[in-house]
C-alpha cells in the first residue's frame, strides 16, 4: 500500500542519479572482491540499488540505505588492510635489517651492460617521486607511506655506493645466457629479482588497484591495452615501473596539449588582428571612393549651391572669430581640408535622411524594409547588390543630394529676404528705443544673421539625430570642443526639420511689452470668456519639470511671452494671475502650501479603503462609461484646481473632500479599462456636479483677485487679505439681527407669536437683492424679546404664561399646511408604499430618538392642535422649529418627502436593533467620503512631485474641452453672480429641543468660513442627501465621544433608498 501511495518521490529521482549511486557501490565491491569481473559487480550493485529504491518509502530512506551500505563496505576494506599490514610488518623490518646480505651479482652484471646501466641511472631520480605518487594513488595508510619512503632512501644510498665501487674495466658475460640485454632485463623483471630495488610488500587489493590504474593510463595515453590476467601475473616491481612510465607519458602529453592550445590562441589573436586591419583598410578605401565622385560634384566651395549648403550643414567648422567679426567669411575659399570635411559631413547626414519612395522604386530587387541610404550602404558592404545596381544607386544618390541642396538654398534665400525686409523697416520699437543701424552694410548683417541661424539649426539637428555625439561648446560660445559626428547617428525627420526652420524664418520678432502696456491693453469690462479660455494652457514658466520652475521670476515669463502676438495680451494677463498666485502660494507661502497639500493627499490615501467591485446591470454600466467620458476633461485638471482652491481659501476640510472625489473618480477610471465598476452612477453624477461647483467657485475668486490686482493695483497678498476681510464682514452682517421692517412683516403674518416669528429667516426669493444665507447655518435664537426700546430675558415665566394660542392663529396654520400639501406632494411623485404611508401618519405616536425626528406637515398640524393654553419655554422653542419647517416645506416639498422616507427607514432600524435583530439593509457610510477626525496628519515621505505647480499645470492635450463644466470655459455672468452659490437652510438636524439647537448653531457659526464653505463643506449641503448622512454621522460621533448613551443604537439609512426617490 505504501508503495502505491508514495510514488511521487520516485519520480523526482533522475536515472543518472540512480546510476551514479550503483556505480559507487560497484567500485567499492571491486576493492573487496578483485577476482570477480566488472559485469558481475555492476549487476550486484544494480540489484542492491533496485531493492533499496523499491523498498524505501521516501527519498531520504532510499539515500540512507545506499549510504549505509557504502559505509559498511568501506569499513570492511579498512579492517582488511589493517590486518594485512600487521601480518607483514615483521617480515618487512627483517628484510630492511638484512640489506647488506642481498646478492650483488645482479648489480655487477647490470653494471657491465652498457645499455641497461644508463637507464638505471636515469631512473634513480624519478624512482622516489614515483613511489610517492604510487603511495598517494593507492590510498595507503601513513605507516605504509613511511615504509615506502624508507625503502626509497635505502635504495638511493645503495645505488650511490655501487657507483663508487665500480671498477673501470669489467669482464663481459657471454651472450649465450641472454641473447640481448633487454631480454635479460625483461627476464630479471619477470622473475622479480631486479637487483638494487626493494619491492614493497603489497596486498592483493593494492595490486588490483594498481592494475586498474595501469589499464586506465594505457587507455588515456593511446597505448595498446594489456589483459588484466597478464597484469595480475606480473611481479609488483614490473607493475610499478609500467605505472611510472605511463605517468610520465601522460604528463608529457598534457604538456604538449597545453602548448598546442597556447599556440592556437596566439594564432587566433593574430588572425583577429589581421581581420581588423583589413576591415580598417576596406573602410578607408570605401570612404575614399565615396569622396571621389562627391568632390567632383563639389569642386569648389566658392559660390555654388553645394558650398552654401555644406556651410549650412556644418556650422561647427566655422572659426570662433565669425561672431566677433561678421565681415569675414566662414572659411578660407581655397582650403581643401575644409572642403573634404564638409563633404564627409554632408555624406554622413545624407545617410540618415529618409529617401522618397519614388527613388527607391527605380532600383530593382531592393528589399522592402530599406528606407534610408544607410540601409543601402549596409547591403553594398555585405555584397548583396550587383555592380549594375551600384551604378544606378550612385546616380540616384547624386540626384537626391542635388534636390536636397536646392531645397535648402531656397529656404536660405527666404531667410535672407526676410532679414532684408526687416532692415528696411523703421529702426525704432514700441518703446522708442533706437535699434542699431545695419543698413549701411546689409551684406555683413545678412552674413552674421545667416551664420547665427545656421548655428542654431545645426545644433538642434545634431541634438535630435545623436544626443551622445553633440558638440560641447565652451562657455564663451565660440569654437566647439568636439566636432565629430557619430556614423551611427539616429534617423532624423528631415521634413519636420524644414517645416520648423521655415516657420522660425517667417515668424516676425515681436518687441517686448512692458507691464504698463500689459495692463493698459486690458478691456475695461474684463472679458472673462477670452481671459480664462486662453488660460486653459499652462503658463510657460511652469512647463518645466520639477520644482525648479518655481524659482523662475515673472520677468522671464514676460520675456518668453514677448514673442507671441499682441492679441493674446488679455489671455496672458489672466494666466499671469494664476501664475502669480501659485508662485506666492496664497497667504501661507508656496513651499508651505505645497507641503500641506502633500500631507493632505497622504492623509486621504492612508484613510481610504479599496472599494469592493459592484455587480451592476448593463444600463448602469453604460451610464458610468458615459459619465466618465464627459467628466474626464474636468477631472484631468483637478490637480491645478486643488492648488488654486487651497491658495484662495485655505479650507482643508473642503480640500480633503476634493482629493477624495478625485481619487474615487481615478479608481473608477482605472477599473473601467478592466471592466470593474466600483462606483454607482448616482454617486459618480454627484461627484461630477460637486466638482463643477468647485471649479465655478475658483473662477469667481480668480475674477475677483484679477480685478483687485489689475484695477486697484494691489499685490497678490494684499488682494487676498482684502478679499478675506470682505468675507469676514459678510459673515458678521449675516449674524446681525434682521431689520425692523422684516420683523414687522413677520409679525403681521404671525401676530400671536412674536418671539417665534422674529427669528424665522425669510425665503431667499422673498427679498430682492438679499444676500442668501449659508446652507446648514441657522441664525442664533434671540436671547431677549424686544418690546419698544426695552428688552427682557426669555426665561421670564410670567411673560410666557400670559401668551396663549387663539383660534385665528390655528386657522392660519391650517391654511399654511393645506398650501404645503397643495404645492406638489403627490403620491405618484413620492412613490411610497402603503405600509410606509401608514407609518408616516402614525409618526407622531412613535417614540423616536433625538436629532433624528423629521417634522412633516402632518406632524406639524398635530403638534399645533395640541398646544395647551399655558405655554412653556420648551413649547415655544418647539413652535419656533415648526414655523421654520413650514416655510421650508413650502419652498422645497420634495426634500420633506425624502426626509420622511429617511425617518421611516430610521424607525425600522431602531425597532430592529431593539428587538436584537440587525437588518441587512443597514449600510455604513463609505470610508471614501468620511475621514475620522482622529486621523493624524501623516508626513510626506514619498519623493513624488505630482502636486507641484509645474506638474499641476501640465496638460495632456488628448481631449477637446467642450464640456460646460470645463475649468475656464465660458463665464457668462459677472463677478457678483459667480460668488456665493448659497443654498437652502439645512433642516435635517433640527431637533425638538430648542436650547440644544441654539448651542449647535452657534458652534457652527464660529466654525464655518465665508462662501466657499457654503457649497464645499461636506456637512452643510441640504440638496445632497449623502452629505446629510455624513453630518448625522459626525453628530453621532461627537455624542459618542461625550458619552451619550441614549443614541447608541442609532443606525443610518441606506443611500440606495434615497437615490431611488431622487431619480
Curated annotation (Swiss-Prot):
Ranges of biased composition (kind: Low complexity): 149-175, 311-342, 443-460, 528-542, 733-758
Major location (coarse): nucleus
Coiled-coil stretches noted in the UniProt entry, renumbered to this chain: none
Record field: transmembrane: none
GO biological process terms held by the UniProt record: positive regulation of transcription by RNA polymerase II; regulation of transcription by RNA polymerase II
Family statement: Belongs to the Mediator complex subunit 15 family.
Protein name: Mediator of RNA polymerase II transcription subunit 15
Lineage: Eukaryota, Fungi, Dikarya, Ascomycota, Taphrinomycotina
